[in-house]
């Protein structure tokens, strides 16, 4: 990054994750070769008093005027649906809402824009543990199944459609179990780990990776993500298998766990060091 001057970064979204990224960019950016050039939020008033007025972008369509090298989306999948392709006209894009890519039209538009404007689409792996190992096993043709279970307190969910009306009859309730593609539209902010898994395993993709959403009233201060995969059979007929469990501390009712904030910052740093090549890349 130091060889080419500061890497100009814009942040779209100013919720908990966006606030953390902006704070770090302002405090640590200069020594890391990063320059924050704008912050946009759907409600501009939320930035008052914490984001310098010169950095507040009022109109997302005008982001090109700030000449960003990288635009970081940490708002909502709708931003990727509505503006992702346009952002790629001006800069590389780091997607913080990978559930948006479950929509095949959106994925196609991003790929086409990426190729046309020669900009990369980076996807933050977020709370997905072992993403690189999943990718390697899949690339080798050995991944047979992949299942991601996300469990937290009901207050930590932001559900839509039929899932929003679902009731938890007991202390632990499975709200959804099935292909990740079917979950993302109704849990856009609670399915990003599963979406990242689908992108890490393109042979299975959004239709083959299984997502499970669990409401558990005992999980008042954490999000729990279980990743289970199976691989090729050995000489005895037993299959290769991995099961990881990630317990991520979280404030009551929070959508984003504390460790995910740190992981996202590392993804931001990583994609600023990767070559800008067209396509969709986990980082």
Swiss-Prot record:
Any one GO biological process: NAD biosynthetic process
Annotated transmembrane regions: none
SUPFAM superfamilies: Glyceraldehyde-3-phosphate dehydrogenase-like, C-terminal domain, NAD(P)-binding Rossmann-fold domains
Assigned keywords, A-Z: Phosphoprotein
Pfam families xref list: Asp_DH_C (PF01958), NAD_binding_3 (PF03447)
Residues annotated with Phosphoserine modification: 20, 168
Record bears the keyword Phosphoprotein: yes
GO molecular function: aspartate dehydrogenase activity; NADP binding
UniProt family annotation: Belongs to the L-aspartate dehydrogenase family.
PANTHER family in alphabetical order: ASPARTATE DEHYDROGENASE DOMAIN-CONTAINING PROTEIN, L-ASPARTATE DEHYDROGENASE-RELATED
Protein's recorded name: Aspartate dehydrogenase domain-containing protein
Organism whose genome encodes this protein: Homo sapiens
């Amino acid at each position: 990054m130091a060889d080419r001057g500061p890497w100009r970064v814009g942040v779209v979204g100013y919720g908990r994750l966006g606030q953390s990224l902006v704070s770090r960019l302002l405090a640590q950016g200069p020594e890391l070769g990063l320059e924050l050039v704008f912050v946009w939020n759907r409600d501009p008033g939320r930035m008052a008093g914490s984001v310098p007025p010169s950095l507040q972008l009022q109109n997302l369509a005008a982001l090109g005027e700030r000449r960003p090298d990288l635009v970081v989306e940490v708002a909502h999948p709708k931003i990727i649906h509505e503006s992702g392709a346009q952002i790629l006209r001006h800069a590389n894009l780091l997607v913080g809402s990978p559930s948006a890519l479950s929509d095949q039209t959106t994925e196609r538009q991003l790929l086409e824009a990426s190729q046309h404007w020669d900009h990369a689409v980076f996807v933050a792996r977020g709370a997905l543990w072992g993403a690189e190992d999943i990718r390697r096993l899949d690339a080798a043709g050995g991944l047979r199944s992949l299942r991601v279970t996300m469990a937290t307190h009901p207050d930590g969910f932001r559900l839509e459609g039929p899932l929003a009306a679902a009731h938890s009859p007991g202390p632990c309730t499975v709200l959804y179990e099935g292909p990740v593609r079917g979950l993302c539209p109704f849990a856009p902010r609670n399915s990003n780990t599963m979406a990242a898994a689908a992108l890490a395993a393109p042979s299975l993709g959004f239709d083959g990776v299984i997502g499970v959403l669990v409401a558990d009233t005992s999980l008042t201060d954490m999000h729990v993500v279980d990743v289970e995969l199976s691989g090729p059979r050995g000489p005895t007929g037993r299959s290769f298998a991995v099961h990881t469990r990630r317990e991520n501390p979280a404030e009551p009712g929070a959508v984003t766990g504390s460790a995910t904030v740190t992981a996202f910052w590392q993804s931001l740093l990583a994609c600023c060091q990767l070559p800008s090549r067209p396509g969709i890349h986990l980082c």
